[in-house]
Regions:
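Feature activates predominantly on carbohydrate-active enzymes
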Residues: 163-369, 374-387, 554-557
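Loop/turn elements at helix/coil->beta-strand transitions in domains of secreted/extracellular proteins
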Residues: 258-263, 309-313, 383-387, 441-448, ...
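Active-site-proximal beta-strand/loop segments in catalytic clefts of secreted hydrolases
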Residues: 153-154, 189-190, 238, 267-268, ...
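Active-site neighborhood of glycoside hydrolase catalytic domains
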Residues: 351-471, 477-484
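Acidic, contiguous N-terminal accessory segments
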Residues: 2-230, 417, 436, 446-458, ...
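Flexible, acidic glycine-rich loops studded with aromatic residues
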Residues: 447-628
Length: 628
């Protein structure tokens, strides 16, 4: 027994001694990279270097200055001039020296946007860790170097909310003096929104240099930039599964990093009604998944403001007359009659596209009174609004045709049970709810958005829907139908959301049976990037339709999404959408790959759990991960 204990003690002593030596070695080892990078033919090439710290040329330095656009995302549309030199500085020496704007409210927004910008820069600085970082750069030299930012918004740029006609253009200049002691940044924009985008571009001209242990900024830059499309959106469904406010904030952070400007908030559906309304508390009481899974008024107001200072509008969708069910159970007990029909009806595939079923009872006049209250409160808590999404998706006519109250209503009006009769009834409903929706105090009459449907078909659209009142969001596959071309030819403004490229929930398997999801395979970032709205329009109409084609929107239905998977399913594919809609490049995805991979790194650095696209090795060894 004694010998056994001696052996154990010897082993333990050896382990402790080895650990002590290892700790001592790690404490003394500089952990500097043995590699440097050089820019060769617009590619950062990895090389071995000696131990001389003066030879260090870090990957971040190379990526900032290599190639015409460095690591800017989305790529600017007009002019990009980036020098091949950087200067180092301390974050405390980065300041907003001047913010010229026509009103105090715009100045306040500029200050908030600058604070967000500076916070994003700070996220790029790693936490101090003596095991891995040594203080290399001369702190006195850093303290002397200053970065001054001046922002000028034109006298006409009083807008503080985004509209379809808002000018989002900007001009950005970075100039460093001969002694590298002062870098002046000037931003000129017509509106706050353009200035905010310029700050995002500026943040992408700054990187942490691990070789120097310091922040660095490109010394000389000129950028002239404006978006190709007015509407650049993401649909977030928070009704199929509840998404927390914090997760929505991360989504908005990522959108801002990519200059996307519209969050389409699909906030209610048949499955749940998580929106608390003061005038109708029973809606969320009966319709939410739990008391903790509700968006109250302050939550909504917070999201709207959080989005606004990041250059994003929030467009709420109240889906009707389809996708309505939970939340409406109380109306019969209150003597208002049944307002939702076919709710949870079986077999569900007969009455709706997916379970649970449910549609509004458009034969019950009390329905309009409740809808008026819903619209008035939504208009208030989401204010200011210039756009409102009325839904109109996947209305099942068989549901109405098997509802006695609706069939009797048709008979009383002398109508039969034909498809045209139901479409007449549906279009009458749509006209009524549009007229009921209150005007906004700032923007006036709100323009409606509808999904493409039987009402928007080539034979019916101009009969039922006034193109001056409605924008049509076109889903479905462009390969299977000419919906977009037909709508454009009839003079409708269109938002493209074709399912064969921009439905990001596809490819994860069916959630009602085994096998593939009904919307097909996974849409990789390359397919998202290559989906050009102008090409779609040109193929179907012979024209790019620049006035009518407002832009596009990636869609994430959340039947298989919650907080845990949201970021990875949206990002970085949402970034591919962003460059398509901001820049609308003539080339395909391949020339964008290096910048795209870096943008994914940037999103992760900022706290967005964006999915991995390639091994880290590919990020460090550009253009070597390919298949020919």
């Amino acid at each position: 027994m004694a010998d056994s204990r001696d052996v154990k003690n010897q082993i333990l002593f050896s382990l402790l001694f080895t650990a002590s030596l290892l700790h001592s070695a790690l404490s003394d080892f500089p952990f500097l990279s043995p590699y440097s990078w050089s820019c060769v033919n617009e590619t950062c090439v990895k090389n071995l270097k000696g131990w001389n710290e003066e030879d260090a040329y870090s990957l971040s330095t190379c990526k900032l200055t290599c190639g015409q656009h460095g690591v800017l995302w989305p790529k600017p549309t007009r002019l990009t001039q980036i020098s091949n030199q950087t200067v180092h500085f301390n974050l405390s020496r980065l300041s907003l020296e001047e913010a010229m704007a026509p009103t105090q409210e715009v100045k306040d927004l500029l200050q908030k946007a600058f604070d967000i910008f500076k916070g994003n820069v700070a996220k790029g600085v790693p936490e101090p860790d003596e095991r891995f970082f040594r203080k290399i750069f001369d702190s006195d030299e850093q303290e002397k170097q200053q970065v001054f930012v001046k922002i000028r918004v034109s006298n006409t740029g009083k807008a503080t909310t985004l509209r379809l006609n808002t000018n989002e253009a900007y001009v950005l200049n970075v100039k460093t003096n001969e002694t590298n002691s002062l870098t002046n940044v000037t931003i000129d924009a017509s509106t706050f929104f353009g200035a905010r985008h310029a700050l995002e571009t500026l943040s992408q001209l700054i990187e942490y240099d691990a070789a120097k242990g310091s922040l660095q900024i490109v010394s000389q830059v000129a950028v002239v930039d404006k978006p190709a499309f007015r509407y650049r959106g993401i649909l977030l469904d928070t009704a199929s599964n509840f998404i927390s406010v914090r997760a929505i904030e991360r989504t908005l952070d990522a959108m801002a990093a990519n200059k996307l400007n519209t969050l389409h908030w699909h906030i209610t559906d048949t499955a749940s009604f998580p929106l608390y309304l003061k005038s109708l508390p029973d809606m969320s009481y009966f319709g939410s998944y739990s008391q903790r899974q509700i968006y109250n008024t302050s939550d909504v107001s917070h999201v709207v403001e959080y989005a606004r200072v990041r250059g994003i509008r929030v467009v709420p969708e109240f889906s009707a007359p389809g996708h309505v069910g939970n939340g409406w159970q109380w109306t019969e007990k209150k003597g208002l009659g049944k307002m939702a029909v076919c709710v949870k009806q079986e077999p569900w595939s007969t009455y709706c596209t997916e379970p649970p079923c449910g549609q509004l009872n458009i034969a019950n006049n009390n329905t309009y009174g409740i809808l008026t209250q819903i619209y008035e409160e939504m208009a208030d808590i989401f204010a200011p609004l210039d756009l409102f999404h009325f839904g109109g998706q996947e209305v099942n006519l068989n549901c109405w045709n098997t509802t006695e109250e609706i069939v009797s209503h048709l008979t009383e009006r002398g109508l039969n049970q034909s498809v045209d009769s139901f479409l007449d009834l549906w279009s009458e409903f749509q006209s009524n709810v549009y007229n009921m929706f209150p005007a906004d105090n700032q923007t006036g009459k709100v323009q409606g958005i509808l999904w493409n449907s039987q009402l928007t078909s080539a034979e019916k659209a101009d009969k039922y829907l006034d193109p001056r009142k409605y924008i049509i969001q076109a889903s479905g596959s462009v390969k299977d139908q000419r919906v977009i071309g037909d709508l454009l030819k009839k003079g409708y403004h269109v938002i493209l959301s074709n399912s064969d490229a921009w439905f990001l929930n596809c490819g994860f398997g069916s959630w009602v049976t085994k096998g593939q999801h009904p919307c097909g395979s996974y849409k990789g970032w390359q397919a998202v990037y290559d989906n050009s709205p102008h090409d779609v329009a040109s193929n179907e109409t012979g024209s790019y339709q620049k006035k009518l084609l407002l832009g596009g929107e990636a869609v994430l239905w959340s039947q298989q999404v919650d907080d845990a998977s949201l970021d990875a399913k949206l990002w970085p594919r949402g970034a591919a959408l962003a460059e398509r809609l901001w820049t609308n490049p003539k080339h395909n995805w391949e020339p964008a790959e290096i910048r795209f991979i870096h943008q994914r790194q940037r999103l992760f650095q900022r706290g967005v759990m964006a999915d991995r696209i390639q091994p880290e090795w590919c990020h460090q060894n550009e253009k070597l991960c390919y298949l020919r």
